[in-house]
C-alpha cells in the first residue's frame, strides 16, 4: 500500500501539477491588474510566464485540480520520513517530526490560499460576469466589485500574492523539504546528491507555484522521489543477498 501511495503522491500527483501549472499565469497583479487579466482568456505572453490562460473557468478548474494534488504531495513528503525510527538517532528523529509539522502547516495554508485566491475567486468572477450579462449589476456596481476583488487579491493577510497566508504556505513548503532532507541525511537513508533536487523543489516551490517555478519544483520532486526509491530498493536487494 505504501509503495502505491509513494508513486501516486510523489510521481503521479507532481506530474499532474506540472501539466496544469504550465497554464498558471503570474505577474499580472500590477499590470493589467488581477481582475483585468483573469476575467478573460489570454494567449501566451512571456510577461505572464504561462503557456496560455483559458479564462476564469480555467482558473477555477485549475485550482480544483491543484488543491487535492498538493494534498497528495504532502502525504508523499510525510512518507519520505516514515522509515526514520529510534535506531536512526535523536537528531534524525527530531528533524522527522519537525518535517511533519512543517508539512502540516504547508498543507493547511496552501489549501486556504487555493480556496480563497483560486477556487473561490474563480467562481466569484464567473458569477459577477453572469450578473453583469443579465443586467443585474450597473456599471458603477460592477466597478465596485472589481475594486473589491482587486483589493482582496493584495490583502496582507489572505491575498493571493505576498500575504501572510501565501508566505506561510510557501516557507512551510521550503522548511518541509529542508527538514525531510536533514532527517534522511542524518539517518543515512539518503545521500547529498539525492537531496539536492529535493531542496531545489522546496526553494522553487517557496518562490512560486505558478509557471515556471511550479512546474520546475514538481519536476525536481519527481527526480528526488524516484532517485530515493531506487536507492532504497537497491539497498534492500543488497541486504537480502547472502554474505
Residue ranges and their predicted role:
Residues 1-243:
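Hydrophobic, aromatic-enriched alpha-helical segments typical of multi-pass transmembrane helices
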